[in-house]
């Protein structure tokens, strides 16, 4: 991995070693990662991985106030393709702008992860948790594909219809999804 960092926290819980093939320094968001992991451990969560990245299309949505309202972006993204609801059934939490690398951002992330597995940091990026890094990444990837479909339709000059609420409810029942 050339542009990602994988670390192992040492037994003293105060230091770490980089275990990836390429020695890439950890993200400046390490405080958020560690705070979230501590929270997950304290709750005996099955989630062991977190991913923070900067998907362009999802970040672009945060520059539109309507998508910062609770579950507006979630419902729009779910409606673009069925896979989005199936791969990201808890939706996309939204965290209003906080200073990057701040304790406030870490605390807001922990709070929002009570209801969502993926959270959007306004005008910054996305943070996801799951059982492993690939599953966390897959959630981000499918959400970003939905954002790309939405933006492509808008660029073609029309508002995409998306799946209806009835169709999304049918998926929830058929696949036994939480929301």
Where are these predicted regions, by residue range?
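Glycine-rich flexible loops
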Residues: 1-179
């Amino acid at each position: 991995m050339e542009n990602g960092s994988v670390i192992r926290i040492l037994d003293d819980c105060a230091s770490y070693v980089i275990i990836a093939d390429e020695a890439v320094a950890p993200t400046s968001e390490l405080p958020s990662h560690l705070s979230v992991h501590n929270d997950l451990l304290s709750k005996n969560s099955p989630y062991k991985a977190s991913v923070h990245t900067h998907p362009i299309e999802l970040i672009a949505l945060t520059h539109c106030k309507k998508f910062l309202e609770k579950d507006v972006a979630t419902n729009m993204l779910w409606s673009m393709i069925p896979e989005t609801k199936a791969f990201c059934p808890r939706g996309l939490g939204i965290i209003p702008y906080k200073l990057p690398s701040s304790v406030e951002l870490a605390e807001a992330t922990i709070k929002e992860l009570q209801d969502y597995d993926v959270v959007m940091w306004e005008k910054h990026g996305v943070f996801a948790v799951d059982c492993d890094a690939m599953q966390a990444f897959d959630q981000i990837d499918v959400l970003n594909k939905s954002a790309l479909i939405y933006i492509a339709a808008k660029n073609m000059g029309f508002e995409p219809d998306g799946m209806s609420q009835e169709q999304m409810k049918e998926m929830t029942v058929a696949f036994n999804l939480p929301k």
